[in-house]
């Protein structure tokens, strides 16, 4: 069942439960963003600055370096805890990611929630919610948490499958309204908590099919995110990683915290 350990390291010794739907921090309960989040990557810190508790998107087409950038952030970012949600990825890619990041020092403060592409749509959608809930639980303990969700596009695909099965008519390129609303609700759950003093910084990868930056999922995510990092295929083909397109990327809070 969902929530069970799959790493062969024994049972999870949890004594508390947290709802998959989470406890979204209301706008009036969020503390102001005042500190820069240190991603550990100079180009991101300098060119696409974002703060602790912000929601940031990584937008790119297939094979442009999203996974490379995500690996770099997991290894270099400064946070009390890191939660990675791998949703709808191939089982081999999930296995490779776990092998790379759960054998070294990062394993002590990193949790991975994985629901590969061969699982049912409802499990893939629940996996994204569980990863977010775990990050929320750690935030409620006063920790500064980094949530990385890969990817919002796969989450939207799962929500679209469920919506179509329930008879909901498709709208933008076949996505029913509930599918796009689902990713919006996931993003809104990140932020700083005034009550606990904890923070949850969200980084969400978005697959731009065919490098189309006007894809419905890209548009929906961009509208609510506090900033986004666009990866360029042209820059990647020159062998420059991370292939950040500075002109297309955006930090909406740079003036406030720098």
Locate predicted features.
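Short, glycine/charged-enriched hinge/interface segments at domain edges or termini
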Residues: 1-75
């Amino acid at each position: 069942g969902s929530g069970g350990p799959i790493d062969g390291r024994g049972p999870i010794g949890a004594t508390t439960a947290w709802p998959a739907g989470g406890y979204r921090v209301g706008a009036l309960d969020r503390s102001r963003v005042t500190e820069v989040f240190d991603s550990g990557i100079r180009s991101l810190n300098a060119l696409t600055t974002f703060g602790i508790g912000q929601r940031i998107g990584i937008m790119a087409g297939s094979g442009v370096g999203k996974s490379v950038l995500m690996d770099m952030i997991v290894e270099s970012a400064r946070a009390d805890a890191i939660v990675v949600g791998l949703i709808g990825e191939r089982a081999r890619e999930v296995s490779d990611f776990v092998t790379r990041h759960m054998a070294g020092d990062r394993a002590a403060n990193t949790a991975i929630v994985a629901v590969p592409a061969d699982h049912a749509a409802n499990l893939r959608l629940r996996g994204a919610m569980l990863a977010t809930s775990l990050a929320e639980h750690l935030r409620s303990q006063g920790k500064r948490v980094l949530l990385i969700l890969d990817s919002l596009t796969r989450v939207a695909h799962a929500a679209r499958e469920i919506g179509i099965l329930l008879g909901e008519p498709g709208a933008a390129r076949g996505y029913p309204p509930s599918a796009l609303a689902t990713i919006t609700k996931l993003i809104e759950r990140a932020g700083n908590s005034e009550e606990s003093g904890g923070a949850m910084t969200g980084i969400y990868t978005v697959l731009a099919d065919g490098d189309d930056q006007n894809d419905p999922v890209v548009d929906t995510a961009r509208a609510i995110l506090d900033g986004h990092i666009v990866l360029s295929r042209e820059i990647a083909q020159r062998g420059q990683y991370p292939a950040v397109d500075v002109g297309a990327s955006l930090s909406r809070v740079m003036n406030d915290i720098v």
